[in-house]
Protein backbone atom coordinates (compact mmCIF):
# COMPACT_ATOMS: atom_id res chain seq x y z
CA UNK A 1 0.00 0.00 0.00
CA UNK A 2 1.74 3.18 -1.16
CA UNK A 3 -1.00 5.66 -0.27
CA UNK A 4 -1.10 6.57 3.37
CA UNK A 5 -2.00 9.19 5.92
CA UNK A 6 0.35 11.94 6.97
CA UNK A 7 -1.19 13.49 10.05
CA UNK A 8 -0.46 17.16 10.50
CA UNK A 9 -2.20 19.95 12.36
CA UNK A 10 -3.02 21.95 9.23
CA UNK A 11 -5.17 19.18 7.72
CA UNK A 12 -8.88 19.98 7.49
CA UNK A 13 -9.92 16.54 8.75
CA UNK A 14 -10.61 15.47 12.33
CA UNK A 15 -8.29 12.55 13.06
CA UNK A 16 -10.12 12.02 16.34
CA UNK A 17 -13.33 11.03 14.53
CA UNK A 18 -12.84 7.84 12.52
CA UNK A 19 -15.57 6.92 10.04
CA UNK A 20 -16.37 3.47 8.66
CA UNK A 21 -17.58 3.11 5.08
CA UNK A 22 -17.83 0.51 2.33
CA UNK A 23 -16.66 0.65 -1.27
CA UNK A 24 -17.23 -2.21 -3.70
CA UNK A 25 -18.16 -4.51 -0.84
CA UNK A 26 -15.00 -3.86 1.19
CA UNK A 27 -14.83 -2.04 4.52
CA UNK A 28 -12.55 0.96 4.98
CA UNK A 29 -11.92 3.70 7.54
CA UNK A 30 -11.64 7.43 6.96
CA UNK A 31 -12.07 10.55 9.07
CA UNK A 32 -14.55 13.37 9.48
CA UNK A 33 -13.79 15.95 6.81
CA UNK A 34 -12.68 13.40 4.23
CA UNK A 35 -14.23 13.00 0.83
CA UNK A 36 -14.80 9.53 -0.53
CA UNK A 37 -11.84 10.11 -2.86
CA UNK A 38 -9.39 11.16 -0.14
CA UNK A 39 -10.44 8.27 2.09
CA UNK A 40 -9.98 5.74 -0.72
CA UNK A 41 -6.56 7.13 -1.61
CA UNK A 42 -5.58 6.99 2.06
CA UNK A 43 -6.49 3.31 2.06
CA UNK A 44 -4.41 2.57 -1.02
CA UNK A 45 -7.29 2.27 -3.49
CA UNK A 46 -5.99 3.46 -6.85
CA UNK A 47 -8.24 2.04 -9.56
CA UNK A 48 -11.84 3.26 -9.39
CA UNK A 49 -13.08 2.49 -12.87
CA UNK A 50 -12.42 1.46 -16.45
CA UNK A 51 -12.51 3.37 -19.71
CA UNK A 52 -15.50 3.03 -22.04
CA UNK A 53 -13.99 1.43 -25.12
CA UNK A 54 -10.91 -0.54 -24.15
CA UNK A 55 -11.48 -1.01 -20.43
CA UNK A 56 -8.25 0.77 -19.48
CA UNK A 57 -7.73 1.29 -15.73
CA UNK A 58 -8.91 4.66 -14.46
CA UNK A 59 -8.01 6.41 -11.23
CA UNK A 60 -8.57 9.73 -9.50
CA UNK A 61 -7.17 12.74 -11.38
CA UNK A 62 -8.46 15.80 -9.52
CA UNK A 63 -9.67 16.79 -6.08
CA UNK A 64 -12.96 18.55 -6.81
CA UNK A 65 -15.56 19.25 -9.48
CA UNK A 66 -12.97 18.84 -12.25
CA UNK A 67 -12.64 15.08 -11.62
CA UNK A 68 -13.35 13.15 -14.87
CA UNK A 69 -13.00 9.52 -13.81
CA UNK A 70 -14.17 8.64 -10.32
CA UNK A 71 -17.92 8.24 -10.90
CA UNK A 72 -19.57 6.20 -8.15
CA UNK A 73 -22.96 4.79 -7.22
CA UNK A 74 -23.71 5.94 -3.67
CA UNK A 75 -26.06 4.00 -1.36
CA UNK A 76 -28.63 1.39 -2.40
CA UNK A 77 -32.38 0.98 -2.82
CA UNK A 78 -34.52 4.10 -2.78
CA UNK A 79 -31.62 6.21 -1.47
CA UNK A 80 -29.21 5.37 -4.28
CA UNK A 81 -27.72 8.13 -6.44
CA UNK A 82 -25.76 7.34 -9.61
CA UNK A 83 -22.71 9.06 -11.09
CA UNK A 84 -21.54 11.06 -8.10
CA UNK A 85 -17.90 12.12 -8.25
CA UNK A 86 -15.93 10.59 -5.39
CA UNK A 87 -14.11 13.90 -5.01
CA UNK A 88 -17.40 15.63 -4.14
CA UNK A 89 -18.95 12.99 -1.87
CA UNK A 90 -18.51 13.89 1.79
CA UNK A 91 -17.63 10.89 3.90
CA UNK A 92 -20.15 9.90 6.57
CA UNK A 93 -20.48 6.91 8.85
CA UNK A 94 -21.97 3.89 7.11
CA UNK A 95 -21.63 5.27 3.58
CA UNK A 96 -21.91 2.58 0.91
CA UNK A 97 -20.59 3.17 -2.60
CA UNK A 98 -19.48 1.15 -5.58
CA UNK A 99 -17.77 1.70 -8.91
CA UNK A 100 -19.89 2.15 -12.04
CA UNK A 101 -17.51 0.57 -14.57
CA UNK A 102 -15.78 -2.76 -14.96
CA UNK A 103 -17.63 -5.97 -15.84
CA UNK A 104 -17.74 -8.59 -14.46
CA UNK A 105 -15.32 -7.05 -11.94
CA UNK A 106 -13.10 -4.01 -11.65
CA UNK A 107 -9.93 -6.10 -11.49
CA UNK A 108 -10.93 -7.97 -14.65
CA UNK A 109 -12.94 -6.09 -17.25
CA UNK A 110 -13.83 -8.02 -20.39
CA UNK A 111 -13.50 -4.79 -22.38
CA UNK A 112 -9.76 -4.79 -21.66
CA UNK A 113 -9.40 -7.62 -24.18
CA UNK A 114 -10.69 -5.33 -26.95
CA UNK A 115 -7.52 -3.27 -26.79
CA UNK A 116 -5.75 -6.01 -28.73
CA UNK A 117 -8.14 -5.41 -31.63
CA UNK A 118 -8.05 -1.61 -31.53
CA UNK A 119 -7.12 -1.23 -35.20
CA UNK A 120 -10.39 -2.93 -36.15
CA UNK A 121 -12.41 -0.65 -33.85
CA UNK A 122 -12.19 2.96 -35.10
CA UNK A 123 -14.08 5.76 -33.40
CA UNK A 124 -17.83 5.24 -33.70
CA UNK A 125 -17.52 1.70 -35.09
CA UNK A 126 -20.53 0.55 -33.05
CA UNK A 127 -22.89 2.85 -34.96
CA UNK A 128 -22.21 0.95 -38.20
CA UNK A 129 -21.67 -2.50 -36.70
CA UNK A 130 -24.85 -3.08 -34.69
CA UNK A 131 -27.58 -2.26 -37.24
CA UNK A 132 -29.88 -5.26 -36.93
CA UNK A 133 -33.26 -4.08 -35.63
CA UNK A 134 -34.10 -7.52 -34.29
CA UNK A 135 -30.89 -7.78 -32.26
CA UNK A 136 -30.62 -4.12 -31.29
CA UNK A 137 -32.25 -4.58 -27.84
CA UNK A 138 -29.45 -7.03 -26.96
CA UNK A 139 -26.74 -4.83 -28.45
CA UNK A 140 -28.15 -1.79 -26.66
CA UNK A 141 -27.97 -3.51 -23.28
CA UNK A 142 -24.31 -4.44 -23.80
CA UNK A 143 -23.34 -1.00 -25.11
CA UNK A 144 -25.07 0.81 -22.26
CA UNK A 145 -23.42 -1.48 -19.73
CA UNK A 146 -20.05 -0.80 -21.34
CA UNK A 147 -20.59 2.95 -21.09
CA UNK A 148 -20.10 2.68 -17.35
CA UNK A 149 -22.72 4.99 -15.97
CA UNK A 150 -24.61 4.22 -12.79
CA UNK A 151 -28.08 2.78 -12.41
CA UNK A 152 -31.15 4.91 -11.82
CA UNK A 153 -33.16 4.08 -8.67
CA UNK A 154 -35.82 1.45 -9.20
CA UNK A 155 -37.75 2.43 -6.07
CA UNK A 156 -39.68 5.59 -5.28
CA UNK A 157 -37.65 8.38 -3.72
CA UNK A 158 -38.70 8.70 -0.08
CA UNK A 159 -36.97 12.05 0.47
CA UNK A 160 -38.62 15.45 0.17
CA UNK A 161 -37.24 18.49 -1.63
CA UNK A 162 -37.78 22.21 -1.26
CA UNK A 163 -37.41 25.33 -3.35
CA UNK A 164 -37.11 29.03 -2.62
CA UNK A 165 -37.25 32.33 -4.48
CA UNK A 166 -34.79 35.03 -3.46
CA UNK A 167 -33.70 38.49 -4.49
CA UNK A 168 -30.26 40.00 -4.00
CA UNK A 169 -28.45 43.10 -5.09
CA UNK A 170 -25.30 41.02 -5.66
CA UNK A 171 -24.79 37.26 -5.91
CA UNK A 172 -21.19 36.10 -5.46
CA UNK A 173 -20.51 32.60 -6.78
CA UNK A 174 -17.41 31.11 -5.18
CA UNK A 175 -16.19 31.20 -1.59
CA UNK A 176 -12.44 31.44 -2.13
CA UNK A 177 -10.38 34.46 -1.04
CA UNK A 178 -11.54 36.57 -4.00
CA UNK A 179 -15.21 35.77 -3.45
CA UNK A 180 -14.94 36.32 0.29
CA UNK A 181 -13.29 39.72 -0.10
CA UNK A 182 -15.88 40.76 -2.67
CA UNK A 183 -18.77 39.75 -0.42
CA UNK A 184 -17.14 41.42 2.58
CA UNK A 185 -16.61 44.77 0.88
CA UNK A 186 -20.12 44.78 -0.55
CA UNK A 187 -21.58 43.74 2.78
CA UNK A 188 -19.71 46.50 4.58
CA UNK A 189 -21.27 48.95 2.13
CA UNK A 190 -24.71 47.78 3.21
CA UNK A 191 -25.67 45.86 0.08
CA UNK A 192 -27.86 42.76 0.10
CA UNK A 193 -25.34 40.02 -0.78
CA UNK A 194 -25.78 36.27 -1.33
CA UNK A 195 -22.62 34.16 -1.29
CA UNK A 196 -22.72 30.65 -2.79
CA UNK A 197 -20.05 27.96 -2.49
CA UNK A 198 -20.22 24.27 -3.41
CA UNK A 199 -17.91 23.00 -0.66
CA UNK A 200 -18.70 22.24 2.97
CA UNK A 201 -16.51 25.10 4.18
CA UNK A 202 -15.47 28.42 2.74
CA UNK A 203 -11.92 29.11 1.65
CA UNK A 204 -11.42 27.64 -1.83
CA UNK A 205 -7.75 27.07 -2.69
CA UNK A 206 -6.73 28.50 0.67
CA UNK A 207 -7.89 25.28 2.35
CA UNK A 208 -5.06 23.48 0.53
CA UNK A 209 -2.43 26.19 1.13
CA UNK A 210 -1.43 26.14 4.81
CA UNK A 211 1.68 28.25 4.12
CA UNK A 212 -0.21 31.15 2.51
CA UNK A 213 0.17 34.62 4.02
CA UNK A 214 -2.56 37.21 3.38
CA UNK A 215 -2.28 40.78 4.66
CA UNK A 216 0.54 39.69 6.94
CA UNK A 217 -1.55 36.94 8.54
CA UNK A 218 -1.35 33.17 8.18
CA UNK A 219 -3.95 32.22 5.58
CA UNK A 220 -6.06 30.10 7.94
CA UNK A 221 -6.21 32.91 10.53
CA UNK A 222 -7.18 35.42 7.84
CA UNK A 223 -9.88 33.03 6.65
CA UNK A 224 -11.31 32.59 10.15
CA UNK A 225 -11.45 36.36 10.70
CA UNK A 226 -13.09 37.21 7.39
CA UNK A 227 -15.72 34.47 7.72
CA UNK A 228 -16.53 35.66 11.22
CA UNK A 229 -17.08 39.22 10.01
CA UNK A 230 -19.14 38.06 7.04
CA UNK A 231 -21.50 36.10 9.28
CA UNK A 232 -21.95 39.16 11.47
CA UNK A 233 -23.15 41.36 8.60
CA UNK A 234 -26.97 41.45 8.64
CA UNK A 235 -27.47 41.71 4.87
CA UNK A 236 -25.04 38.97 3.86
CA UNK A 237 -26.39 35.44 3.38
CA UNK A 238 -23.96 32.53 3.06
CA UNK A 239 -24.84 29.17 1.51
CA UNK A 240 -22.29 26.36 1.63
CA UNK A 241 -22.75 22.96 -0.04
CA UNK A 242 -24.59 24.98 -2.71
CA UNK A 243 -23.78 24.63 -6.41
CA UNK A 244 -24.84 27.30 -8.88
CA UNK A 245 -25.66 25.36 -12.04
CA UNK A 246 -27.61 27.70 -14.33
CA UNK A 247 -27.62 31.37 -15.31
CA UNK A 248 -30.72 32.55 -17.17
CA UNK A 249 -31.87 35.81 -18.71
CA UNK A 250 -32.23 38.87 -16.52
CA UNK A 251 -29.66 37.60 -13.99
CA UNK A 252 -31.65 34.64 -12.71
CA UNK A 253 -29.37 32.10 -11.04
CA UNK A 254 -30.41 28.59 -10.05
CA UNK A 255 -28.48 26.78 -7.33
CA UNK A 256 -29.02 23.52 -5.46
CA UNK A 257 -28.22 23.30 -1.76
CA UNK A 258 -27.44 19.94 -0.19
CA UNK A 259 -29.05 19.92 3.24
CA UNK A 260 -28.73 16.31 4.36
CA UNK A 261 -26.56 14.46 1.82
CA UNK A 262 -23.56 14.66 4.16
CA UNK A 263 -25.41 13.00 7.05
CA UNK A 264 -25.57 9.25 7.80
CA UNK A 265 -28.83 7.74 6.55
CA UNK A 266 -30.00 7.03 10.11
CA UNK A 267 -29.58 10.70 11.08
CA UNK A 268 -31.48 12.23 8.17
CA UNK A 269 -34.79 13.78 9.12
CA UNK A 270 -37.88 12.49 7.33
CA UNK A 271 -39.65 15.81 7.92
CA UNK A 272 -36.88 18.03 6.51
CA UNK A 273 -35.92 18.40 2.85
CA UNK A 274 -32.87 16.63 1.53
CA UNK A 275 -32.02 19.39 -0.94
CA UNK A 276 -33.30 22.86 -1.75
CA UNK A 277 -33.45 24.57 -5.13
CA UNK A 278 -32.78 28.31 -4.94
CA UNK A 279 -33.94 30.65 -7.68
CA UNK A 280 -32.17 33.94 -7.11
CA UNK A 281 -32.83 37.12 -9.05
CA UNK A 282 -29.83 39.45 -8.79
CA UNK A 283 -29.04 42.98 -9.88
CA UNK A 284 -25.39 42.02 -10.31
CA UNK A 285 -23.48 38.73 -10.38
CA UNK A 286 -19.82 38.17 -9.50
CA UNK A 287 -18.23 34.92 -10.66
CA UNK A 288 -15.31 34.10 -8.36
CA UNK A 289 -15.08 30.42 -9.21
CA UNK A 290 -11.30 30.15 -9.29
CA UNK A 291 -9.32 28.13 -11.80
CA UNK A 292 -8.67 24.52 -12.81
CA UNK A 293 -5.19 23.17 -13.45
CA UNK A 294 -4.48 21.87 -16.94
CA UNK A 295 -2.72 18.49 -17.07
CA UNK A 296 0.10 17.90 -19.54
CA UNK A 297 -0.11 15.29 -22.29
CA UNK A 298 2.22 12.28 -22.49
CA UNK A 299 1.96 8.56 -23.19
CA UNK A 300 -0.20 6.55 -20.77
CA UNK A 301 -1.16 9.67 -18.84
CA UNK A 302 -4.45 8.00 -17.89
CA UNK A 303 -2.93 5.41 -15.53
CA UNK A 304 -4.15 5.33 -11.91
CA UNK A 305 -1.77 7.29 -9.71
CA UNK A 306 -1.42 10.13 -12.23
CA UNK A 307 -3.08 13.33 -11.00
CA UNK A 308 -2.78 17.04 -11.51
CA UNK A 309 -0.07 18.60 -9.37
CA UNK A 310 -2.62 20.69 -7.49
CA UNK A 311 -4.64 17.57 -6.64
CA UNK A 312 -1.55 15.92 -5.14
CA UNK A 313 -1.01 19.03 -3.03
CA UNK A 314 -4.67 19.22 -2.00
CA UNK A 315 -4.76 15.62 -0.79
CA UNK A 316 -1.56 16.18 1.19
CA UNK A 317 -2.31 19.56 2.76
CA UNK A 318 -6.08 19.47 3.15
CA UNK A 319 -6.73 15.78 3.82
CA UNK A 320 -3.39 14.53 5.13
CA UNK A 321 -2.99 11.94 2.37
CA UNK A 322 0.22 11.24 0.46
CA UNK A 323 -0.88 9.66 -2.80
CA UNK A 324 2.63 8.19 -3.20
CA UNK A 325 6.03 8.09 -1.54
CA UNK A 326 8.06 8.37 -4.76
CA UNK A 327 6.62 11.26 -6.74
CA UNK A 328 7.53 12.62 -10.15
CA UNK A 329 6.14 16.01 -11.13
CA UNK A 330 6.18 17.70 -14.53
CA UNK A 331 5.53 21.41 -14.87
CA UNK A 332 5.76 24.24 -17.35
CA UNK A 333 5.26 26.99 -14.75
CA UNK A 334 5.97 28.03 -11.15
CA UNK A 335 2.67 26.76 -9.77
CA UNK A 336 3.85 23.20 -9.02
CA UNK A 337 6.94 24.20 -7.03
CA UNK A 338 5.16 24.86 -3.73
CA UNK A 339 3.44 21.49 -3.94
CA UNK A 340 6.77 19.80 -4.68
CA UNK A 341 8.28 21.43 -1.58
CA UNK A 342 5.32 20.34 0.55
CA UNK A 343 5.60 16.74 -0.63
CA UNK A 344 9.34 16.66 0.01
CA UNK A 345 8.95 18.08 3.52
CA UNK A 346 6.33 15.40 4.20
CA UNK A 347 8.95 12.73 3.56
CA UNK A 348 8.28 11.93 -0.09
CA UNK A 349 11.03 11.51 -2.66
CA UNK A 350 10.25 14.15 -5.30
CA UNK A 351 11.66 14.64 -8.79
CA UNK A 352 10.45 17.80 -10.55
CA UNK A 353 10.88 17.92 -14.33
CA UNK A 354 10.52 21.51 -15.58
CA UNK A 355 10.08 21.87 -19.33
CA UNK A 356 11.68 25.30 -19.09
CA UNK A 357 15.46 25.35 -19.43
CA UNK A 358 15.64 28.36 -17.11
CA UNK A 359 13.09 28.03 -14.30
CA UNK A 360 12.32 30.74 -11.80
CA UNK A 361 15.54 31.01 -9.77
CA UNK A 362 13.80 31.76 -6.47
CA UNK A 363 11.50 28.76 -6.70
CA UNK A 364 14.32 26.51 -7.89
CA UNK A 365 16.40 27.43 -4.84
CA UNK A 366 13.44 26.85 -2.51
CA UNK A 367 12.82 23.45 -4.05
CA UNK A 368 16.46 22.41 -3.69
CA UNK A 369 16.41 23.55 -0.05
CA UNK A 370 13.35 21.37 0.58
CA UNK A 371 15.05 18.32 -0.92
CA UNK A 372 13.40 18.32 -4.35
CA UNK A 373 15.42 16.96 -7.27
CA UNK A 374 14.80 19.68 -9.88
CA UNK A 375 15.51 18.76 -13.51
CA UNK A 376 15.33 21.88 -15.75
CA UNK A 377 14.83 21.26 -19.44
CA UNK A 378 13.21 17.85 -19.00
CA UNK A 379 9.73 16.55 -19.77
CA UNK A 380 7.85 13.28 -19.34
CA UNK A 381 7.43 11.41 -22.61
CA UNK A 382 5.49 8.50 -21.15
CA UNK A 383 4.35 6.73 -18.02
CA UNK A 384 5.03 3.04 -17.42
CA UNK A 385 2.71 0.60 -15.70
CA UNK A 386 -0.38 -1.51 -16.27
CA UNK A 387 -2.88 -1.04 -13.43
CA UNK A 388 -1.04 1.88 -11.83
CA UNK A 389 1.89 4.11 -12.66
CA UNK A 390 5.25 2.49 -11.92
CA UNK A 391 7.76 4.81 -13.59
CA UNK A 392 8.12 7.91 -15.74
CA UNK A 393 10.31 8.20 -18.85
CA UNK A 394 12.02 11.59 -19.13
CA UNK A 395 13.38 13.24 -22.26
CA UNK A 396 15.61 16.27 -22.71
CA UNK A 397 13.98 19.41 -24.15
CA UNK A 398 15.81 21.69 -26.57
CA UNK A 399 16.79 25.21 -25.55
CA UNK A 400 13.94 26.71 -27.59
CA UNK A 401 11.51 24.25 -25.90
CA UNK A 402 10.10 23.19 -29.28
CA UNK A 403 11.65 19.74 -29.70
CA UNK A 404 13.21 16.77 -27.94
CA UNK A 405 17.00 16.97 -27.93
CA UNK A 406 17.83 13.66 -26.28
CA UNK A 407 16.84 10.80 -24.03
CA UNK A 408 16.56 11.09 -20.29
CA UNK A 409 16.38 8.70 -17.36
CA UNK A 410 13.49 6.44 -16.42
CA UNK A 411 12.50 7.18 -12.83
CA UNK A 412 10.52 4.75 -10.71
CA UNK A 413 7.52 6.31 -9.00
CA UNK A 414 4.18 5.44 -7.43
CA UNK A 415 2.56 8.84 -8.07
CA UNK A 416 2.88 11.33 -10.88
CA UNK A 417 1.59 14.88 -11.18
CA UNK A 418 1.59 17.42 -13.98
CA UNK A 419 0.90 21.13 -14.24
CA UNK A 420 0.29 22.91 -17.52
CA UNK A 421 -0.97 26.14 -15.98
CA UNK A 422 -4.40 27.30 -14.89
CA UNK A 423 -7.65 27.88 -16.77
CA UNK A 424 -10.49 29.99 -15.28
Give the ranges of each region predicted by the language model:
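Residues forming the flavin
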Residues: 2-424
